Amino acid sequence: MSGLTHFDESGSAHMVDVSEKPVTARVAVARGAVKMSAETLALVTEGRAEKGDVLGVARLAGIMGAKRTADLIPLCHPLPITKVALELTADPALPGVVVEATVKTGGQTGVEMEALTAVSVACLTIYDMVKAVEKGMEITGIRLLLKEGGKSGRFEASA
């Protein structure tokens, strides 16, 4: 593992200088889930939540979250994101909703934080939209599954 890049020689936090890095195609995929009761999941999948279309709103929130990552995470570079896609899948075996985000860019740094932020914001939105019926939901398993492009090459999480 290489050293921490967000600290200078004196130990102060700083934004990494990526100006000398080549522009390359980059992609990141992240996943997480919101565990809930089967009854709450039925509310979500049947469109009976009081606040409206839970999965549709969460998808939009995730896209917005990816686009605002540099505003939320202090040392992230603002990036020209070329794609954000979210898949929200009801999983009766959890029970709950699995959220997966794919983010792409052509740039000098990766989009891992954007993918992780998209998943996090989508999961938080699901929680917000149905917390009136179940406050004990669990947001879980948020992690990077894939990172590709740039000097460090390809990373794929183990199963």
Curated annotation (Swiss-Prot):
Top-rank taxon of the source lineage equals Bacteria
Q: Which sequence ranges are marked TM in the entry?
A: none
Q: In what pathway does it function?
A: Cofactor biosynthesis; molybdopterin biosynthesis
EC number per UniProt: 4.6.1.17
Q: What PANTHER family does the record tag this protein with? A: MOLYBDOPTERIN COFACTOR SYNTHESIS PROTEIN A
Similarity comment: family membership: Belongs to the MoaC family.
What is annotated about its quaternary structure and interactions? Homohexamer; trimer of dimers.
Q: What is this protein called?
A: Cyclic pyranopterin monophosphate synthase
Instruction: Supply the source organism for this entry.
Output: Cereibacter sphaeroides (strain ATCC 17029 / ATH 2.4.9)
